[in-house]
């Protein structure tokens, strides 16, 4: 471990300048800067001055949402212990030590720029790996859903579906019984239809009265009876006329005697 990454206040050594910078910030939180003489710079005299490392200065413009490193509880407890040991020092000496530590920290962070670029590359690789992992998980879930759907389709193909009402049954026997109920309903419907047709025909025949001689139809029996009487009178007239024709003299026959003439005149 190099000596340049050592804290000038508590003489702790660190692996890189970034860790040393975080440690120096803890010193600034525990030991606020006193009123500085005019020889110190305005930045050091500002009570709101906060020590930042090289990475936070360069990346604040690029990645403002990136979180800074947090203090460890163990380091805070050690700093409190160091504070109790350094109470004997004067405030001016502590301020001078802080200024020297800040200068050395800035120099060490300048030299450690390649390390920050390497860490950025590692972070980028981690992000890419995380994205690939999420994509692979999404693809796995989609395949899982597709397999469930295919399994359901295969299971449905094993079932038996009624073509009339689209009901599904687990066995062919159940489907056969269901189809029998459909056939029974159809037969009952056909029987009702035939009965209704017969009734309609019967009503139509009973409501109409047809003459057997000329096939005329009448709405009532009385009208049909009057029509039949007309047929009877016509028959009598035809018979009478036929009798008259028979009683005529035939020139081809011999002349009748007087007795036959008297008999024909009586009729």
From Swiss-Prot:
It is found in: Nucleus. The keyword Nucleotidyltransferase does not apply. Its main location: nucleus. Keywords: Metal-binding, Nucleus, Repeat, Transcription, Transcription regulation, Zinc, Zinc-finger. It comes from the Eukaryota. The gene is ZAT1. Pfam families: zf-C2H2_6. Residues 52-62, 83-97 have a biased composition (Basic and acidic residues). InterPro entries: ZAT1/4/9 (IPR044303), Znf_C2H2_sf (IPR036236), Znf_C2H2_type (IPR013087). Probable transcription factor that may be involved in stress responses. This is Zinc finger protein ZAT1. GO terms for biological process: regulation of DNA-templated transcription. A zinc finger (C2H2-type) spans 5-27, 160-182, 209-231. GO terms for molecular function: DNA-binding transcription factor activity; zinc ion binding. Residues 63-73 have a biased composition (Basic residues). The keyword Repeat applies. GO terms for cellular component: nucleus. It comes from Arabidopsis thaliana (Mouse-ear cress). Residues 34-99, 181-204 are annotated as: Disordered. SMART domains: ZnF_C2H2 (SM00355). Disulfide bonds: none annotated.
